[in-house]
Amino acid sequence: MTGPVPDARVIDGKAFAAGLRARIADAVPAFRAATGRAPGLAVVLVGDDPASAVYVGSKGKATVAAGMASFEHRLAATATQDEVEALLRQLNADEAVDGILLQLPLPGHLDEQAAVATIDPDKDVDGLTPVSAGRLALGIPGMVPCTPYGCLLLLQDRLGDLSGKDAIVIGRSILVGKPMGQLLLGANCTVTMAHSRTKDLPALVRRADIVVAAVGRAEMVKGDWIKPGAIVIDVGINRLPPADGAAKGRLVGDVDYAAALGVADAITPVPGGVGPMTIACLLRNTLVAAHRRAGLADPEGF
């Protein structure tokens, strides 16, 4: 007996990410054979934020499952700027570490920008250092932020060549919006960058073949904003207030999913769309960084 037929309009980020992680795991033995070691990812957690601790744990498990070495470093919430940066410099010098991820946000007394800038750009698997941002803007090979890169992979899997597509990115954060715009430009899209001050946003969205929503407002993008046949990538993750009698509210994206599903050619759900791609692309970046640091060609297919 077979289960229900999946809705072809729903982009299954979970399944795509699982396939990507499997391909990464398949590529690790060749690197190990060439270098005598596994690619290594170090994650730094400052403080005891519960959500950050969960993220760090899931990243560690995924790293080990891919056959890579996982290094976890925890500092107290009272850690000083000097202590954080000293640990990052220590990891920069550690030959067993190919990728460094500083879990954000940091406690409020710390300077996130200065800490991130301490990371060796060749180990910057989150793609957040000023050097990584500059390389992306100039089209020079480097590390690309994981979430927007995951979005690009989902789009290319669905559409193939993106050349000539009209794309709109709603949101201008350094984590998603800005690098997403650069990646779409690099893929030969015509890109509109929108944000909270953009005038007549619905009209701009209605022109777009590709909509990437990363603004952090629950269900802000309405179904009647979407052009029929568009591809919608919803990066948002927002928890609504609990309904009567419920312990907690449901998770929704930045797009009114139910309404958009009836108009779009395809859309990512929340959860289960973009989220799983982030960790998969973190592993991909670690694999690529390891090859480049070892003087090897980028692994085929990545």
Swiss-Prot record:
Q: Which domain of life is it from?
A: Bacteria
Q: What does the record give as its pathway?
A: One-carbon metabolism; tetrahydrofolate interconversion
Protein's GO biological process: L-histidine biosynthetic process; methionine biosynthetic process; purine nucleotide biosynthetic process; tetrahydrofolate interconversion
Catalytic activity from the UniProt record = (6R)-5,10-methylene-5,6,7,8-tetrahydrofolate + NADP(+) = (6R)-5,10-methenyltetrahydrofolate + NADPH; (6R)-5,10-methenyltetrahydrofolate + H2O = (6R)-10-formyltetrahydrofolate + H(+)
Cite the entry's keywords alphabetically. Answer: Amino-acid biosynthesis, Histidine biosynthesis, Hydrolase, Methionine biosynthesis, Multifunctional enzyme, NADP, One-carbon metabolism, Oxidoreductase, Purine biosynthesis
| Positions annotated to bind NADP(+) | G171, R172, S173, S196, I237
Q: Which InterPro entries match?
A: Aminoacid_DH-like_N_sf (IPR046346), NAD(P)-bd_dom_sf (IPR036291), THF_DH/CycHdrlase (IPR000672), THF_DH/CycHdrlase_cat_dom (IPR020630), THF_DH/CycHdrlase_CS (IPR020867), THF_DH/CycHdrlase_NAD-bd_dom (IPR020631)
- One of the record's GO cellular component terms: cytosol
What EC number(s) has UniProt assigned to this enzyme? Answer: 1.5.1.5, 3.5.4.9
Q: Name one GO molecular function term.
A: methenyltetrahydrofolate cyclohydrolase activity
What family is this?
Belongs to the tetrahydrofolate dehydrogenase/cyclohydrolase family.
Q: What does the record note on quaternary structure?
A: Homodimer.
> What function is annotated for this protein?
Catalyzes the oxidation of 5,10-methylenetetrahydrofolate to 5,10-methenyltetrahydrofolate and then the hydrolysis of 5,10-methenyltetrahydrofolate to 10-formyltetrahydrofolate.
* Name by which UniProt lists this protein: Bifunctional protein FolD
Query: Which species does the entry assign this protein to?
Result: Sphingopyxis alaskensis (strain DSM 13593 / LMG 18877 / RB2256)
Q: Which gene encodes it?
A: folD
